[in-house]
């Protein structure tokens, strides 16, 4: 396992270590980070064993499954969400372990009273809180993590939003989390897990740090508990080195721990594309992305960003077996096969070797247990939001959270502009639409305009809910009137300033200067000036050669690489590059 020392997007914290004992060894961990990160960075990936003695490691990585439970200073804790701060000893839970019952203290039990209780401080929960607060409705948010933000904290990429006034569009996930949380964190109960819903609309909580039990009495309940990873079945699916995307992404982007440097990704959807891309940013090599369907999933612009890096996407392929290393503490290969309807075709098996991690990105399952029980306790006064109701993008979760806030207000009889509710509802529906292809090829200016001055090409061929590019152009040259249209450049207004290139969340805007044979490409990883490169199209096919002349640094950390092209027939085909020496 590897500690991430440098990152093109994340601001890494100053090193400040604490120490604890693990099986007779002294382990150093970064202050504020989890026990799981410290153990993995020290090379200890096995946290428990099955009843037959097989090694076990992290499974969900977000505190939902209990697979990583260990004894922390004598208490059972989930090490994926337990900080190293103040910890003295960590050890595996013995097979015959039976915790000692401890009488509850005689102190006063806290009972919070509010109008709306929100379970889950992720995108949906925080958006609901923000809107409820704006409407003047008292609320309390409960989350079992040490920081609010949920899945947004794990996301380093820019997000798609279609907005009348720019707020979240083009923002990175972790920045959206901070914005939604706001300056005041009053009414947010962190490190608290909901362990039951009781009669009389009472919610039972337990603080996972102090073990304090408390209650919330609320009139309305919003369940925004997110989702859990779906894990397909294959041989050796339980060995360390096989991790769900949630584990891989959280450890990488929040705990700054890279679980492997030679990655096989399973699942060609948005999660598969983005975790692979983010792993590359953190220093990993992606061997391939395999997909059981006969076509790619997710947004085409997300698939393009990994293809331009030379990462192969293999459709109609399934994972048959993970090949463990000698001591079953990791993987060294995988057996894949061609498939039809997800069934492997005999005789097509092949081995992908020289890997040290399998990144499982095969979807999510709503974590809706509290929503189901909430219906019997709160009746019609329970609401679901985000992935707890429908698996979708963070954009959808935010909009559904806001929609729920308006629905609560209606039930309470509060007056507000109904058009606001309709607008949020429309945006929520639009955010779930599948991208619809509208163009066969990107729009480009005529030959006279192309040779007169620099210009941009927007390689956005599908209509979907995103428009940060329209706010980026200082000349107002980019328009996108609806979620079902594509952005269009008015080349009479465009002056070729390239300010839009780094503001596309899908990295799908490229700049060209035919007079100088120069291309301007968005980059979000370390780039060395003077390097010779192969120029590639959106499929990763080589279409020319060039040299990186200059890297223009940008505040949003999507920089511009100015590349001098050579040996290229059509400059407009260039969408990326691959280093000649890798």
Model regions: which residues?
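Short, solvent-exposed secondary-structure boundary/capping segments
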Residues: 90-91, 553-565
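Acidic (E/D-rich), amphipathic helical modules within compact regulatory domains
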Residues: 455-459, 464, 468-507
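Short alpha-helix capping/helix-loop boundary micro-motifs
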Residues: 461, 517-523
């Amino acid at each position: 396992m590897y500690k991430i020392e440098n990152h093109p997007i994340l601001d890494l914290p100053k090193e400040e270590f604490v120490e604890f004992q693990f099986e007779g060894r002294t382990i150093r961990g970064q202050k504020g980070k989890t026990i799981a990160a410290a153990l993995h960075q020290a090379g200890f990936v096995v946290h428990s064993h099955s009843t037959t003695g097989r090694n076990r490691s992290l499974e969900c990585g977000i505190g939902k499954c209990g697979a990583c439970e260990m004894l922390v200073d004598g208490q059972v804790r989930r090490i994926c969400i337990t900080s190293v701060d103040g910890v003295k000893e960590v050890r595996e839970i013995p097979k015959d372990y039976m915790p000692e019952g401890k009488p509850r203290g005689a102190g006063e039990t806290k009972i919070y009273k509010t109008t709306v209780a929100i379970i889950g401080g992720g995108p949906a929960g925080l958006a609901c809180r923000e809107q409820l607060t704006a409407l003047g409705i008292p609320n309390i948010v409960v989350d079992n993590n040490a920081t609010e933000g949920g899945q947004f904290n794990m996301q380093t990429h820019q997000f798609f939003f279609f907005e009348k006034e720019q707020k979240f569009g083009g923002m990175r996930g972790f920045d959206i989390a901070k914005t939604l949380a706001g300056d005041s964190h009053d009414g947010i109960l962190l490190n608290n897990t909901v362990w039951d819903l009781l009669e009389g609309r009472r919610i039972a909580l337990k603080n996972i740090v102090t073990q304090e039990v408390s209650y919330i009495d609320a009139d309305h309940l919003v369940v925004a508990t997110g989702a859990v990873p779906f894990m397909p079945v294959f041989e050796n699916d339980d060995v360390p080195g096989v991790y769900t995307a949630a584990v891989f992404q959280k450890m990488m982007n929040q705990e700054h721990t890279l679980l492997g440097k030679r990655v096989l990704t399973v699942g060609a959807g948005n999660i598969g594309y983005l975790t692979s891309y983010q792993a590359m940013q953190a220093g990993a090599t992606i061997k391939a992305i395999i997909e059981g369907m006969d076509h790619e999933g997710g947004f085409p612009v997300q698939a393009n960003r990994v293809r331009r890096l030379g990462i192969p996407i293999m459709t109609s392929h399934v994972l048959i077996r993970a090949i463990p290393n000698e001591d079953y503490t990791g993987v060294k290969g995988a057996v894949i096969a061609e498939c039809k309807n997800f069934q492997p075709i005999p005789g097509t098996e092949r081995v992908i070797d020289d890997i040290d991690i399998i990144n499982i990105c095969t979807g999510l399952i709503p974590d809706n247990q509290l929503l189901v029980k909430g219906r019997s306790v709160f009746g019609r006064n329970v609401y679901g939001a985000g992935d707890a109701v429908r698996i979708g993008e963070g954009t959808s979760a935010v909009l559904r959270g806001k929609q729920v806030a308006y629905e609560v207000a209606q039930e309470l009889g509060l007056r507000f502009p109904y058009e606001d509710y309709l607008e949020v509802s429309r945006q929520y529906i639009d955010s779930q639409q599948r991208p619809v292809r509208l163009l066969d090829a990107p729009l480009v200016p005529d030959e006279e305009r192309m040779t007169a001055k620099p210009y941009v090409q927007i390689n956005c061929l599908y209509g979907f809910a995103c428009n940060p590019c329209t706010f980026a152009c200082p000349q107002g040259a980019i328009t996108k009137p609806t979620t079902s249209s594509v952005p269009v450049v008015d080349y009479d207004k465009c002056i070729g300033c390239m300010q839009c290139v780094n503001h596309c969340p899908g990295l799908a805007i490229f700049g060209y200067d035919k007079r100088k044979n120069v291309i301007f490409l968005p980059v979000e990883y370390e780039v060395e000036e003077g390097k010779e490169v192969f120029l590639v199209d959106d499929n990763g096919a080589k279409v020319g050669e060039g040299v990186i002349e200059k890297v223009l640094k940008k505040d949003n950390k999507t920089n511009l690489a100015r590349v001098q092209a050579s040996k290229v027939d059509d400059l407009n085909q260039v969408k990326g590059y691959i280093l000649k020496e890798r």
